[in-house]
């Protein structure tokens, strides 16, 4: 399949398992608790309403979890080149989590209005429109989430 071809994959209003291709995918989970996996290509993924698990592969992917408590998984690269891509999370909110390797070399960096999740010199995720001070990185449970406000 040509890498520049766009493949449209659409779920239902119920929970679906949606699997992308090695090309450029446009995935819309629509409703329900979806499990979405993409591979190579610069993909655009929308989870829709529901608590979705979105695993993006190599390429520079743009992801919207939309409604629900979504989990974004960053470790689905199929390439031997770890710098080949990253996921750009467009709407990270309080109920969402990013699952990552849990490596001690991972860190959060504020770059302008975005936070970058970096492992060594490899960018794993760009989180749009959030402040690094509002996030916590948990190496034991291998996730990044909004910090819990102890006064709330």
Residue map of PLM features:
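Low-complexity acidic/polar repeat-biased segments
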Residues: 1-7, 104, 109-152
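Acidic, glycine-rich calcium-binding repeat modules characteristic of RTX/beta-roll
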Residues: 10, 15-105, 110
């Amino acid at each position: 399949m040509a890498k520049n071809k766009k493949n449209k994959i659409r779920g239902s209003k119920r929970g679906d398992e949606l699997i992308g291709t090695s090309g450029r995918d446009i995935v819309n989970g629509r409703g329900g608790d979806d499990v979405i996996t993409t591979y190579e290509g610069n993909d655009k993924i929308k989870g829709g309403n529901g608590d979705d698990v979105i695993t993006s592969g190599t390429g520079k992917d743009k992801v919207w979890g939309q409604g629900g408590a979504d989990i974004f998984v960053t470790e689905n690269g199929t390439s031997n080149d770890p710098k080949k891509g990253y996921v750009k999370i467009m709407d990270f909110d309080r109920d969402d989590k990013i699952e990552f390797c849990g490596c001690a070399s991972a860190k959060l960096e504020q770059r302008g209005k975005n936070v970058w999740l970096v492992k060594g010199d490899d960018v794993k995720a760009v989180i749009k429109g959030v402040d690094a001070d509002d996030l916590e990185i948990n190496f034991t449970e291998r996730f990044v989430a909004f910090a819990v406000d102890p006064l709330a």
